[in-house]
Each structure stands twice: as structure tokens, then as C-alpha cells.
């Protein structure tokens, strides 16, 4: 609806119930302390506990942890129909837009083709820490939120502001750790006399 990026998590780990939980914390909590930690001055007001998650059928979105956490917090889960990839167009489009925004600007880019790359030494210039990448992606999100979206004919941030004016601000989670714990996997063990 707003086309806003509500949250993200940068990790070297494969997608999992844990990374989904971390991303939901980022979605639901006030981003100002996190932005200060990244030393980024921008307004990312899009936050709050979602009422609905529209997901594809990846294993991390079918986890017991996600189902349990969403049930505890009144978040409805809605899955894309199997074999219907066009239902994921909005999410796939934002990923494509993000990749287009960052591809030619990140240190070590390979550019679109060898002619465009020229003498640029991609391999020796490719050096970012995860924190630097997270900061860079955050700035890209800020640019995206403030740029006119072709489908909306207005910036996503303006669409968010209109929605908030109409229906109010979503409830922001203030206890991030407690919220995260509700979305973490549980491992069940049988206790015996010997351990």
C-alpha cells in the first residue's frame, strides 16, 4: 500500500526464524536509537507492530516460531498462493529497486558490464564491514522513501504520512528483547536423571 521499507536486518547467516524475528523487531520498534548507533541523521518514522504479514512460502516464514510469535501478538499471517509468483511482485520489485540503487555505488561494484567498469579494480576496492553495509543500505532506504514512486505518483514516505493521518500510528513495541524472544525458535528437550 505505502511501498515503504518497514525494516531490515543485515546478516551473513542464511534466512531463518531468527533473522525473521530480528527483522520484525526492526519493523515494530522505534528506529531512532538504531539510527543514532549507525550515526545516520534521517527520519525513518515507519515503525509499529504489523496487523498482517503477507509472505511467500519460504521455510523461514512457515516456522513454528513465527506462527507462535504472531499468534501472541495478534499478527495475521497470509501466504502467497503456491505456483503464483506474480503475487510477490511488490516485494520483488522493491528488491530490484534497491539493487539498482546500490549496484553502481558500492565500493567494489562490477558495474553493469565490462565497458562501464573500464579500469576500475572491483576486487581490490570491495571492502565494507557489515556495519558499513547496514549504514549504506539505511541511507538508500531514506533516499527511496523520499523519492517519487512511479506506481504511487508520490514518495512512499508521503503515502505513509497520509495513512497515519487516516488510521493512526501503529503501536510501537518498546520492549524489543521481550518481543524478539516471542519469535525465537524453541528447542524441546527431555530431562532425565542423567541429564
Where in this protein do the model-derived segments appear?
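Acidic/histidine-rich, metal-coordinating catalytic segments
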Residues: 36-61
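Flexible loop/turn segments at secondary-structure boundaries
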Residues: 15-18, 60-63, 85-87, 151-152, ...
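A short, conserved beta-strand element enriched in hydrophobic/aromatic residues
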Residues: 1-37, 50-51, 79-82
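Short, conserved catalytic/metal-binding motifs centered on acidic residues
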Residues: 3, 53-56, 88, 144
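RNase H-like two-metal-ion nuclease catalytic core shared by retroviral integrases
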Residues: 55, 63-73, 78-121
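A generic secondary-structure signal for well-formed alpha-helical elements
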Residues: 27-35, 57, 73-77, 98, ...
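C-terminal or mid-to-C-terminal helical accessory/interaction module adjacent to the motor/catalytic core
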Residues: 121-132
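C-terminal, beta-rich DNA-binding module of retroviral/retroelements integrases
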Residues: 135-195
